[in-house]
Amino acid sequence: WGIPAGFDSAGFLAAAKANYVKLQQAWDSGDLAELSEFTSNDMFITLTHELRARGGKSNTEVVTIDADLLGIESTADEHIASVKFDGTLKVDGEIERVSEVWNLAKPVRGGGWVLAGIQQLD
C-alpha cells in the first residue's frame, strides 16, 4: 500500500476530479450508458438500483472538489487506487459538503480506471 515510484499522481488526480464531475452529471441525468463507461460491473448494478429508488432527476453542481491519492494496492488481477474527495456541492439549490473515498480499479493486463466503490466519510 502506497504510491509507486514514478506514478503520475498529479495527472491521475486531475483525471479523477474530471471524472468525478462527469459521473455526478451522469448520476443527475440518470444516464446509464455514461455511468457504465466509468464503473465496474458491481458498482454499475448498485448505482442502477439506487437510481431506480431515487426516481426522477437531480440537479447537482460541483462547486469545489479537492482530491487526495491515499494509496494504490496491487493484486494479481488489478490495481486499486483510493482517492479521497472533499468539496462542496449544490444539490437542488442546497449547499452540501461532501467527503468520501472512491476506490478505482484497473486491470493489471490493461484497461482504464473505473469506479469500484464509494465510502461516505461524513
State each model region's role.
Residues 29, 49, 86, 98-100, ...:
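General N-terminal targeting signals
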